[in-house]
Amino acid sequence: MLLVATLLVAGCRGDETSPQSEPDVRGGCGPIEFADVRGEPPSYLETHQLDRFPNDHAVCAGVWLRTGQGFVPQGVVVEGGTAWESGFDGNAPLHERYCILERYDVRTGARLGRLDPVAGQVGDREPLSCRHGGGLVRDHHGLWLVETSRLWLIEPETLDVQRVWALAPPLRGSFSLIDGQQRIGIGRWYPHDPARVDWFDTDQIVGSGVLDITIAMSSGHTAAPRATQGGVWAALGGRPAAPWFAQSVTRCGILAGPEDTRRRAFVPGAEGMDLVGDDSLWVISESGTQHYQRLGGRPVVPQLMRLDVSDFASWRRPDCGV
């Protein structure tokens, strides 16, 4: 568990040698300015100016999250005016980077709730705490929090833990998404190899009575690019709905789709994503967190952004690498 967690945290950094280059100058609802970002600006920022990045013309809104105490957000769900973010405490020692779950009003940036740590137990096994919190999705059962070796079901309003399942190897919870059949995709991150998403029926998980989710319960799998940090099921650029994946390091972001599509430049440090309606793509970025800003040289961008993807077909290609 600790070794995998070490790899996951290292994966969030990746190769930091390829910064984004010139920003986009086309029309759109963005780019937004520093003063447009909702919520209280982090006190640790050394500038009151947002950095530009390619395709930032599509950024319509931003929200500052409370990352001054070390919170590094990884997953996001948005419904109505509320956003839920999962992540970990980046200031803690590596083996103690337990999950944190927060709930925000995206219209004001106010934090509405917090679960820290996320703790529970698999059946009658020993109590434990969640680690990393790499993926977050929601369906009719509630919030599904994916971590390295477990899957958590959490009530959205109270943030109470409902149930916990263990992920049996080779399953690994690095990121997650929900597909058009309402299956949950549990994504495995690898530093140098392609990622993989294994699909599961959540009704089957809840109704089965099992404590361990195994690969045999999967209804299929999807290949994902190397360095995938987050995924979303979306119909982008006039194409049928399919999984799209955020490949990122804190200075670069790339959005990659099906094999016959071209990659697009994306939010630096992009992690989890959630599509609301047809054109509003909410994206978590870890680049603007205290954990990475204090390392120096990372772009200043809001930790939560909403992008208009209505002109996605014309978005620029990436000019940086991960």
Locate each region found by the language model.
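Loop/turn-rich, solvent-exposed surfaces of beta-rich toroidal or solenoidal domains
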Residues: I215-E259, R263, E271
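Residue position within the beta-strands of beta-propeller blades
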Residues: E85-S86, L145, I186, F245, ...
